[in-house]
């Protein structure tokens, strides 16, 4: 396994208690929407992609949630999860990994994940090769 640091943009968090919520709930709201049409659950660098995809979605009200600890978030009672997810019409999940664990929150067609072995190379080139881009995620959001 090879690890590398990515040059990721730092984003403003809508949740002012994000550090506490990340530690105690495993997730926090990055971009809020009062009555979201869609909530995107994302982890790691996919949060940046989710924010870009949300900006490309046509007329949709979108909440973006960072889920750095999926196991902790999944262990919360449904009422606590709903406080973070909101009450959207759809939940879309994205991760540069398999979708299995995300299926408890979204339908298979709403999991924008990589359910196959990848390839090696610069992160942006590999993502483009695999079709794992903000533009492709925006297509799912616009369905």
Regions found by a protein language model. Name each.
Residues 2-143:
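Thiamine diphosphate
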């Amino acid at each position: 396994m090879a690890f590398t640091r990515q040059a990721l943009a730092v984003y403003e968090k809508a949740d002012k208690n994000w550090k506490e919520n990340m530690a105690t709930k495993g997730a926090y709201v990055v971009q809020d929407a009062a009555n979201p049409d869609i909530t995107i659950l994302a982890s790691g660098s996919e949060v940046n992609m989710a924010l870009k995809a949300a900006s490309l979605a046509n007329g949709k009200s979108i909440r973006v949630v960072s889920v750095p600890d999926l196991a902790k978030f999944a262990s919360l009672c449904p009422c606590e999860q709903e406080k973070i997810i909101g009450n959207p019409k759809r939940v879309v999940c994205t991760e540069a990994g398999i979708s299995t664990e995300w299926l408890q929150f979204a339908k298979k067609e709403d999991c924008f994940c990589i359910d196959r072995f990848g390839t090696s190379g610069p992160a942006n080139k590999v993502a483009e090769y695999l079709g794992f881009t903000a533009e492709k995620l925006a297509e799912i959001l616009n369905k």
